[in-house]
Design a protein with these regions (language model features):
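Short beta-strand micro-motifs within the conserved protein kinase catalytic domain, predominantly
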Residues: 51-62, 70
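Extended, low-complexity, intrinsically disordered C-terminal regulatory tails
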Residues: 217-226, 247, 252-254, 261-323
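ATP-binding glycine-rich loop module of kinase domains
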Residues: 2-34, 39-40
Length: 323
């Protein structure tokens, strides 16, 4: 699907995001799932999911109009020289995103696409509300039916979502459950704290899967080095959870808060991009895989008198897939 910025005809200052998808010829139709999940969360009054304004179709296209949001977490993270957030921001994001997953699971849905695709709350730095929003549900799947009954796992399942964050169950072509969403969330959280994941440049998903197994054994200490000790407890809790078992969301949140307290981190402080306002501008120039040379040139010539950081070194090297 393609995304456009649109305005309210009655108020040109009111901006929205419109996702558009062809009626036919898509490799994978995703807009229907976006509408189903967002309308479900909207009916439940859950925070942290973009408000759906309108949805419909024409003879050629399907469309979804929704609340305009800011850059995704991946672009904000990659806008930084070290490609990682401060510990305070990483833990705040972790706390909010695990709450979003808990709400999604309570509604009977799996995300199956947990990556840094969650977004900040404003489409520019002045409108940011400190809220992290979850969106992009093209790979979502129900694990409970409409009566609330658990759906039996299939014998085989396709590997879907972003390989970097795929859980071990996905690598084994098994159906996923809420604990697998949390495993993907865990990889994302480590990346927010430390920077690109060690398997980020691997081309083969089997190789990625083998490395993910190794971090449970001989590579555990290397993988978790530089992270609060509490992350080891969180990983163990996720790994112990069985397919039909409810994950220990409360334990995970407690451990994140414990990590913050032990590191003397104030979880009420603003996000990095709310302090360093140049991050918003720079994130808009960062592509899905990295920062382009053209973006670097535009940033170097940019004029932003408010908290100007255009003189900072800009990474103009060819992007790595992990970035």
């Amino acid at each position: 699907s393609d995304v456009f910025i649109v305005s309210d005809m009655a108020d040109s200052q009111q901006k929205y995001a419109m996702k558009v998808e062809k009626q036919h010829g898509n490799i994978r139709a995703v807009l229907k799932l976006d509408v189903m999940v967002l309308s479900c969360m909207q009916r439940r009054g859950v925070v942290g999911f973009p408000m759906m304004i309108a949805a419909g179709r024409t003879s050629a296209y399907k469309y979804l109009v929704m609340q305009m949001l800011g850059p995704d977490l991946g672009k904000l993270r990659r806008s930084l020289p070290e490609k990682r957030f401060s510990l305070a921001t990483a833990l705040k994001v972790a706390l909010q995103t695990v709450d979003r997953l808990h709400a999604l699971h309570d509604a009977g849905w799996l995300c199956r696409q947990r990556r840094e695709g969650a977004k900040s709350g404003g489409w520019n730095d002045e409108q940011d509300n400190g809220q992290i929003y979850m969106l992009d549900f093209g790979f979502a799947r129900r694990f409970r039916d409409t009566e609330g009954n658990l759906i039996r796992p299939r014998a085989n399942a396709a590997l879907v979502g972003t390989f970097q964050y795929a859980p071990l169950a996905a690598h084994a072509h098994k159906d996923q459950s809420p604990k697998d969403d949390l495993e993907s969330w865990f990889y994302m959280t480590v990346e927010l704290i430390k920077g690109p994941l060690p398997w980020g440049n691997f081309k083969d998903y089997h190789q990625m899967g083998n490395y993910k197994k190794a971090i449970r054994n001989e590579k555990r200490s290397d993988f978790l080095s530089g992270c609060p000790d509490e992350l080891g407890t969180i990983m163990d809790s996720i790994d112990r959870t069985q397919f039909f078992e409810e994950p220990q969301y409360d334990l995970i949140s407690r451990e994140i808060r414990s990590a913050a307290a032990r590191a003397d981190v104030d979880l009420e402080m603003p996000f990095d991009w709310q302090i360093e306002r140049w991050m918003f501008r720079r994130a808009h120039f960062v592509g899905d895989l990295g920062e382009s040379n053209m973006a670097s040139e535009r940033l170097a010539n940019a004029d932003d008198s408010d908290n100007d950081r255009s003189s900072l070194p800009v990474d103009a090297t060819p992007p790595l897939e992990s970035r």
